[in-house]
């Protein structure tokens, strides 16, 4: 059994993917093989976890009994088991049909079910117990995201010696939305169990501070509030990407060659317009398809000079809103191709698939215009990845004002995705921008991201948490 880690990450999912081929870097555990998943969070936390012999607690992604704890590249992994029922109620239900839509501005109506809440609580309790078991005395525990909002308080109850951080990867809603949540006081008290609660944007932190005062009468000053005789800090830490990794990939001759090949396969159009998202109703996929269709109908764009590639990664496929979205998106793609495609040249290439990092990098390199048009998004890493991949190539980013990334990527072609004419206008400006201007915009955004990468994000959060820990100790 894993014991006594000075640094523990608790997240819904483990940072590894199960491998089915013969990848040499994979590790075995109970007959199953794993490798680190390519996400930015893993890359950011890997050095900290490796240096401190850290532990990551999370679910393997499939229902049923969990494999035994194992190690991948110096990180101890403690898999959590979720039964079929728990996947349905805690993951698909309370996390992704109640909290996800509510925190994303109610863009789809959240569904409230009592039995989902009960299971959410039970599963959160199990994650907290697992963290309490592996954390060394005085350890730092960093809890991630909306699936585990009750964990900080549950953990503190069992282990008051721990320094507890929480980071919310999605937006934190304004008071009037949060107040709809039947479990609202419990969720808020859950988060207040942390010493530091991190948000993507300042607005999220402010919403949280105001909500605590409104719901629990907790006084605050600046970013610090007082709760049950403790200080809790709420601040913004905008997450970022592994900029160097994406730049390296985009510089790789094989990736460049693949980008050329992609353009050739698309019929060497003048303009390749790209969208890359999980197939999620928060991402504004339909809105951007509609803007493209209207520009084709207006004659401002035409096939085969302009083509669109929409990658829509399968996601949460058993949740009703996601099934409905898939039908709507696929109908719209069919309509556009029916009206504007030519034999052998569809107007929209729609790919409901997952890709490797290098294939994604090749797509970014191949695209003249990247469309990121969420109705609401905590950050949106795809926008940042596209910028990182465009080293010398210019290219233009159309970006929704409602993505957290819009707070940093000010040289993008910003738009309001609800305003169709505005989206069309931003897309046309991106398509027609001259090369010098495109390069100028891209290089300003790159300069920003080179400095504000995911490693900077993790160390800012952890330094801030350590400072709180230091202050606490000084007070005692
Ligand atoms: P979200 O976290 O809501 O899915 P983000 O844009 O912040 O949205 O992050 C998505 C991450 O998933 C990015 O790192 C992106 O590269 C990756 N990704 C998106 N689509 C695919 C895909 N089809 N295959 C593999 N990775 C993908
Ligand atoms: C968002 C959430 C993450 C989640 C990811 C993929 O980024 O903030 O917590 O892991 O989407 O969603 P999934 O439901 O497949 O884990």
Predicted feature descriptions by range:
Residues 1-476:
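Catalytic cores of carbohydrate-active enzymes across secretory and cytosolic contexts
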């Amino acid at each position: 059994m894993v014991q006594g880690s000075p640094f523990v990450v608790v997240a819904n999912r483990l940072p590894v993917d199960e491998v089915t081929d013969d990848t040499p870097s994979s590790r075995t555990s109970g007959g199953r093989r794993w490798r680190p998943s390519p996400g930015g969070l893993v890359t950011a936390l890997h050095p900290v976890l490796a240096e401190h012999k850290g532990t990551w607690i999370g679910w393997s992604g499939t229902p049923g009994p969990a494999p035994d704890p194992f190690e991948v590249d110096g990180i101890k992994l403690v898999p959590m088991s979720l039964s079929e029922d728990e996947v349905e109620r805690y993951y698909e239900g309370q996390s992704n049909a109640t909290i996800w839509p509510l925190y994303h501005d109610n863009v789809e109506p959240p569904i409230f079910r009592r039995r989902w809440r009960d299971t959410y609580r039970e599963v959160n309790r199990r994650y907290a117990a697992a963290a309490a078991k592996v954390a060394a005395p005085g350890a730092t525990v960093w809890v991630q995201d909306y699936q585990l909002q009750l964990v900080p308080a549950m953990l503190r109850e069992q282990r008051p010696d721990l320094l507890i951080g929480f980071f919310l990867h999605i937006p934190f809603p304004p008071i009037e939305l949060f107040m709809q949540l039947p479990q609202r006081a419990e969720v808020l008290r859950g988060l207040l169990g942390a010493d530091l609660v991190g948000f993507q944007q300042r607005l999220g932190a402010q919403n949280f501070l105001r909500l605590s005062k409104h719901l629990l009468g907790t006084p605050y000053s600046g970013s610090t509030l007082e709760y049950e005789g403790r200080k809790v800090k709420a601040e913004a830490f905008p997450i970022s990407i592994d900029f160097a990794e994406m730049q390296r990939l985009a510089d790789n001759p094989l990736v460049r060659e693949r980008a050329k090949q992609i353009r050739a396969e698309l019929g060497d159009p003048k303009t390749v317009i790209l969208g890359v998202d999980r197939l999620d109703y928060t991402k504004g996929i339909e809105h951007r398809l509609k803007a493209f269709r209207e520009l084709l109908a207006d004659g401002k764009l035409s096939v085969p000079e302009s083509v669109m590639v929409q990658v829509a990664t399968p996601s949460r496929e058993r949740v009703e809103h996601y099934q409905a979205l898939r039908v709507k998106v696929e109908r719209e793609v069919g309509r556009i191709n029916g009206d504007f495609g030519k034999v052998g040249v569809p107007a929209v290439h729609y790919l409901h698939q997952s890709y490797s990092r290098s294939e994604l990098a090749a797509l970014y390199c191949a695209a003249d215009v990247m469309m990121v048009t969420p109705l609401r998004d905590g950050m949106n890493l795809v926008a940042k990845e596209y910028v990182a991949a465009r080293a010398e190539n210019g290219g233009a980013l159309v970006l929704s004002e409602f993505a957290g990334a819009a707070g940093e990527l000010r040289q993008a072609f910003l738009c309001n995705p609800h305003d169709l004419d505005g989206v069309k206008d931003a897309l046309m400006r991106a398509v027609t921008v001259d090369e010098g201007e495109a390069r100028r915009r891209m290089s300003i955004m790159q300069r920003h991201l080179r400095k504000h990468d995911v490693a900077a994000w993790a160390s800012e959060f952890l330094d801030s948490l350590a400072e709180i820990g230091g202050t606490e100790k000084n007070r005692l």
